[in-house]
């Protein structure tokens, strides 16, 4: 961090049981290198990125196992506005193993940015009418934010597993697997809700189900998002990963955009998004990246 002239790093964590211990050790290590920490607590990964911009640090580490099994955990790292991946990660590991670390005495401060995050979204995204929706957080950390967000947007909710529990006792929080959407589909059949939304363990991937129980896979979601984004950004590039349907490229061209296929991996997609200045990108895994108004 200091090599990139970073003075403060935001640190957040998802709801996994090992999160408090790992995040505490991480923050102590960051402080021992002379860098300050803004501790934002247990939050979804998108809120961590928001905090890095909102607090003007440009740097954040999310302690998260994403969609992996409950006993897994790890770090998603952004320093100086860049998400670390590939050789940058291996170089960091080498530096840690060799003990080539800076010394210092940073400070930790607790910061609550949830209300700022919610207000940013609610002030920007306006629904044309009220909706009743099913929200399945899979006992992941999205449950700490999503219900309040959708209610503030004017939605009536049918909540499934929105209490955060790192054991994931009901089903695994991975909406890319149809088996994990069965409860959403059942709730849609048993209620008059018109849309189902499901999140992964750290709240940065989305599953969508229609009232008829049809799963709208992420490449089809991108077709809809591209239509909206291209209406405001005619001729813009839209990025997608290699796992998406070839129909996505056709749809983007039909809407006047320029499709660009790129490598799978949220860090790789984000790096290409920054390089190209594209307003929208997405992956078949369910990661969607908006850069037009955010």
Specify the residue positions occupied by each region the protein language model found:
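Short, surface-exposed alpha-helical segments at coil->helix boundaries
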Residues: 19-24, 89, 143-147, 249
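Proline/glycine-rich low-complexity loops and linkers
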Residues: 47, 90-119, 123, 211-284, ...
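Glycine-rich phosphate-binding loop
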Residues: 57-66, 70, 188-210, 215, ...
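Gly/Ser/Thr-enriched, mixed-charge loops and adjacent short helices
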Residues: 73-191
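Short, flexible coil/linker segments at domain boundaries that flank nucleotide/cofactor-interacting
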Residues: 4, 126-130, 233
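Short glycine-centered, acidic/aromatic-flanked micro-motifs in structured strand/loop junctions
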Residues: 12-13, 79, 135-137, 210, ...
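N-terminal small/polar loop signature for handling phosphorylated ligands or for N-terminal nucleophile
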Residues: 2, 6-72, 119-120, 148-209
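Short glycine-rich phosphate-binding loop at a beta-alpha junction
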Residues: 6-14, 132-134, 236-242, 279
């Amino acid at each position: 961090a200091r090599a990139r002239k970073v003075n403060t790093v935001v640190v957040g964590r998802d709801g996994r049981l090992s999160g408090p211990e790992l995040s505490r050790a991480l923050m102590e290590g960051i402080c021992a290198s002379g860098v300050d920490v803004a501790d934002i607590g247990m939050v979804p990964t998108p809120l961590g990125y928001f905090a890095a911009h909102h607090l003007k640090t440009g740097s954040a580490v999310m302690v998260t196992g994403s969609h992996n099994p409950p006993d897994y955990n790890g770090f998603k790292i952004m320093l100086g506005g860049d998400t670390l991946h590939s050789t940058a990660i291996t170089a960091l590991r080498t530096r840690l193993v060799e003990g080539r670390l800076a010394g210092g005495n940073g400070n930790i401060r607790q910061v609550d940015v949830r209300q700022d995050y919610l207000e940013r979204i609610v002030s920007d995204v306006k629904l044309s009418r009220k909706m009743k929706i099913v929200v399945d957080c899979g006992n992941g950390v999205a449950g700490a934010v999503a219900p309040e967000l959708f209610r503030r947007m004017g939605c009536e909710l049918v909540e499934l597993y929105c209490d955060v529990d790192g054991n994931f006792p009901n089903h695994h929080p991975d909406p890319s697997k149809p088996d994990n959407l069965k409860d959403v589909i059942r709730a849609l059949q048993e209620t008059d809700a018109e849309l189902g939304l499901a999140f992964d363990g750290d709240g940065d991937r989305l599953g969508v189900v229609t009232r008829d129980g049809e799963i709208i896979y992420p490449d089809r979601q991108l077709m809809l998002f591209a239509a909206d984004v291209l209406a405001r950004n005619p001729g813009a590039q839209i990025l997608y990963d290699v796992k998406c349907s070839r129909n996505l490229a056709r749809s983007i061209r039909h809407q006047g955009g320029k499709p660009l296929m790129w490598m799978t991996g949220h860090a790789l997609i984000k790096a290409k998004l920054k390089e190209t200045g594209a307003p929208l990108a997405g992956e078949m895994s369910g990661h969607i990246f908006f850069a037009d108004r955010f």
